[in-house]
Amino acid sequence: MLKNLLATKPVQDLTAAGESNDLRRTLGPAALTALGVGAVIGTGIFVLTGLAAANNAGPAIVLSFVIAGVGCAFAGLCYAEFAAMIPVSGSAYAYSYATLGEFIAWFIGWNLVLEYLFGAAGVAVGWSRYVVKLLEAFHINLPPALSNAPLDIAPGHGLVQTGAMLNLPAVLIIAVVTSILVAGVRQSSFVNSLIVAIKVAIVVLVIAFGAFYVSADNWRPFIPENSGEWGVYGWSGVLRAAGIVFFAYLGFDAVSTAAQEAKNPQRDVPIGILGSLVICTLLYVLMSGVLTGMLPYPRLNDAAPVAVALEAHPELLWLTIPVLIGAVAGLTSVMLVMMMAQSRIFNVSRWLAAAGVPRNASRMEDAGVLDRADGRLRRDHRRSVSAHTTRPACLDRHVDCFHHSLHWRAGAALRSA
């Protein structure tokens, strides 16, 4: 039994099994880079920037983003090297199966499933909140009973009833994203690239117009003096802020799950991973620099620091609605990439079994938790159908877990790495 648990699959067999699959190689470096940017840039650029600057790093938050970006780049290099050697879907699940054995692969595979599950479900809740705010800007009010979860997690009380019926916007966006993914990877990639272009354009718009209202006085001192407590300003604050804004980089590993659909995975996947990290780091640094320059950093201690910065300069209030649109677009692409990546984890266990893998822990469906139908390919579209249709079922619980899902997803990502 121990021998089976530690058994590995030769790289040649993994590659051969992947080549015999029905997935088409249609994604180039630009599409893969867009996948990475789509997965990484969500609300982190609009939320974490202000909180980390106000409470930890001050204007030096730009250094925190650079430090976090460099750390992610090292992890990205590992993913890039593995993706070049083992150009199949499955990401860390397939890599660990080739190197560490079936049991470790099974453990990492389910951690990836949890990462994408809680990530997409939590982001759907956040998407709902931004859509409600956007509708309110046009004087359209959605009843609270249809925009909140019937259950919430209260500290010290566990699950409590909220009196709401269901989070209708969250359910609808999951259904829409599922439909896009079932249509096919080419269509999904096109929609993702379009959404990424919209949200990046809005971020650049805020940076460009906000730069005219930057005051160098707000950047002095660049690294505020430490308050006497570790992590509150000073260099310790810069490092602590780097750990906080690390959450804003989660998702770049999703690029590796599309290796089996890359035209030239040995070249395109590394470009997609590292290219997306460079673009995201650049946008994060510029946005944080502009925000801390527009007003004193203590005033950014708000869950919506961009809105606070815009309100401090009435001439920029017209950017409020574009920022909401950018947040909605950002979260939409995050959901799309997360759900696409999870289907790849489900699908890889299916074709590994078809390639002759022993029936044991390496097949997630053999664990008795994942149904054998999950991961089945719809041959006319080369996409996983059952893995996508399980997502609305997961969301039927309607538990409002937006804040908790960030920590669950981060923990799963670190364990899988």
Give the residues covered by each predicted segment.
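Select transmembrane alpha-helical segments in multipass membrane proteins
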Residues: 25-36, 101-114, 169-173, 231-245, ...
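Membrane-helix boundary/coupling elements in multi-pass transport proteins
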Residues: 74, 88, 111-129, 244, ...
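Extracellular loop-to-transmembrane helix junctions
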Residues: 24, 45-157, 165, 236, ...
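Helix-loop-helix junctions that connect adjacent transmembrane segments
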Residues: 13-24, 62, 139-170, 194-320, ...
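Membrane-interface "cap" regions at the ends of multi-pass membrane proteins
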Residues: 1-50, 54-59, 72-77, 86-89, ...
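Loop-to-transmembrane helix boundary motifs in multi-pass membrane proteins
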Residues: 24, 29, 167-171, 263-284, ...
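Hydrophobic alpha-helical segments of multi-pass membrane transport proteins
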Residues: 133, 202-206, 345-346, 394-417
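Transmembrane helix-loop boundary segments of multi-pass membrane transporters
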Residues: 51-57, 61, 112, 123-130, ...
